[in-house]
């Protein structure tokens, strides 16, 4: 089973952002930031994006690995085949 383990919450992001450790790595990326935001003026209303990151939450590129049109870290991680480990 592919698992995503929460490492830490990030404070300087809009919405809710968390660093996860992926096991096994996804496309060579062991750490990702999953960011959920509300978009009141968008037809989607909310979205969650996944970005490759360091363990500290630094994002070298804002090219997203995945996007889902809902406010859910679990749904975004499931879209790339991972289950959040509790």
Spans of model-derived segments:
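Compositionally biased non-globular segments, especially hydrophobic aliphatic-rich helices
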Residues: 7, 55-57, 79
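Negatively charged, low-complexity tracts enriched in Asp/Glu with abundant Ser/Thr
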Residues: 1-26
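Short, compact, well-ordered microdomains
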Residues: 65-86
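A detector of low-complexity, intrinsically disordered, Ser/Thr/Gly/Pro/Ala-rich segments
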Residues: 1-3, 16, 46, 52, ...
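Acidic, low-complexity, intrinsically disordered interaction modules
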Residues: 25-71
């Amino acid at each position: 089973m592919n698992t995503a383990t929460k490492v830490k919450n990030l404070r300087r992001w809009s919405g809710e952002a968390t660093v996860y450790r992926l096991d096994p790595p996804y496309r060579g990326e062991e750490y990702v930031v999953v960011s959920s935001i509300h978009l009141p003026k968008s037809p989607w209303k909310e979205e969650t994006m996944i970005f490759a990151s360091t363990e500290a939450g630094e994002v070298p590129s804002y090219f997203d690995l995945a996007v889902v049109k809902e406010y859910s870290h679990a749904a975004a991680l499931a879209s790339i085949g991972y289950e959040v480990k509790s």
